[in-house]
C-alpha cells in the first residue's frame, strides 16, 4: 500500500494516493451510518492533525468507529508511534485487517472488533468519523464523550449546522477547507465533558446513493472538523473564538 513513511514531510497528494488504496466498507449498514470519507477529506483532516498541530507523528492514536481503517492507516502512514482502530462491525474490521498489507504498518496498528465502550487507557490523539446521529439520534455524542475520556486531543467530524450551497461550491472548487465558528451546542457539550474547541474547519463531503431512503444520486454537504483539546480546569472560559472567514487554509 505504498512506501512506509515516518517523521518526514509527506506530500498531501502522496497521502491521498495511499488512502485511495484503502478499500471501503463492502456492505455498509444504514443504522450504523457507515459513510466512508473520501481520500481528499481524510488527507485534509490528517494533514491538519500532523502538520498544523503536530498531533500524529510519534503519537499514540485511536480511531473510534474506524470502519475499514482509512483514518487509522493514514495516521500510521504519517508516522504515528502506534494506532488502535475499533469498530462494532465485524466485516469492517476484517476489511481493515486486509487493508493493512504493509508489514511496517501492521506492526504498529491494532484492530479491535467491539463497542467503543470497551476502550480504556490514554491516547495522545483521537481521530473519528462518528455516526451523524440521523438514523440513531445523538449517536455522535457517545463518541465525543469517549474520545474526551481517553484522548488528550480529538479530531472529530460532525454535520455542519446548516445547509449552505454557496459554501459547498466554494469548498469543492478550492478542494480545500475553511476555518469557521463552532455551533453553540457543540461548544457547550464539549466543555461539559472536559474539552475546549481549538478550531473548526468546514470541508466538503459527498455521499453517493447507497440506501433505499436516499433520494438523490449524490448528496453534497458540509462536514465540520472539530479540533478539541482536553482541559484540566473546568472554569476555563470557552466563549466562542473569533475565527477568520473567507480564507482558504
Predicted regions and their residues:
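S-adenosylmethionine
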Residues: 111-224
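Short alpha-helix immediately C-terminal to the canonical SAM-binding loop
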Residues: 93-94, 164
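Conserved glycine-centered beta->alpha loop in an early N-terminal alpha/beta scaffold
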Residues: 65
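Conserved SAM-binding loop of SAM-dependent methyltransferases across substrates and taxa
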Residues: 68-80
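S-adenosyl-L-methionine
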Residues: 2-62, 94-122
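Conserved SAM-binding motif I beta-strand of class I
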Residues: 82-87
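Core SAM-dependent methyltransferase catalytic element
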Residues: 212-238, 242
Amino acid at each position: 500500500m505504498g512506501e512506509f513513511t515516518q517523521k518526514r514531510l509527506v506530500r498531501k497528494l502522496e497521502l491521498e494516493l495511499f488512502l485511495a488504496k484503502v478499500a471501503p466498507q463492502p456492505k455498509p449498514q444504514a443504522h450504523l451510518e457507515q459513510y466512508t470519507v473520501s481520500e481528499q477529506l481524510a488527507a485534509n483532516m490528517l494533514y491538519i492533525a500532523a502538520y498544523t498541530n503536530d498531533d500524529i507523528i510519534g503519537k499514540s492514536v485511536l480511531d473510534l468507529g474506524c470502519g475499514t481503517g482509512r483514518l487509522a492507516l493514514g495516521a500510521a502512514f504519517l508516522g504515528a508511534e502506534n494506532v488502535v482502530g475499533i469498530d462494532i462491525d465485524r466485516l469492517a474490521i476484517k476489511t481493515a485487517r486486509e487493508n493493512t498489507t504493509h508489514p511496517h504498518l501492521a506492526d504498529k496498528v491494532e484492530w479491535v472488533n467491539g463497542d467503543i465502550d470497551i476502550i480504556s487507557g490514554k491516547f495522545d490523539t483521537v481521530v473519528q468519523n462518528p455516526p451523524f446521529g440521523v438514523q440513531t439520534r445523538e449517536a455522535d455524542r457517545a463518541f465525543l464523550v469517549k474520545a474526551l475520556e481517553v484522548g488528550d486531543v480529538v479530531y472529530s467530524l460532525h454535520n455542519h449546522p446548516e445547509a449552505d450551497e454557496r459554501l459547498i461550491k466554494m469548498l469543492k472548487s478550492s478542494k480545500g477547507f475553511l476555518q469557521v465558528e463552532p455551533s453553540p451546542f457543540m461548544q457547550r457539550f464539549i466543555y461539559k465533558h472536559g474539552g475546549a474547541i481549538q478550531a473548526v474547519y468546514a470541508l466538503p463531503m459527498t455521499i453517493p446513493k447507497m440506501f433505499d431512503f436516499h433520494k438523490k444520486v449524490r448528496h453534497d454537504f458540509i462536514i465540520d472538523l472539530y479540533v478539541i483539546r482536553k482541559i484540566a480546569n473546568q472554569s476555563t472560559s470557552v466563549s466562542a473564538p473569533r475565527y477568520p472567514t473567507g480564507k482558504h487554509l
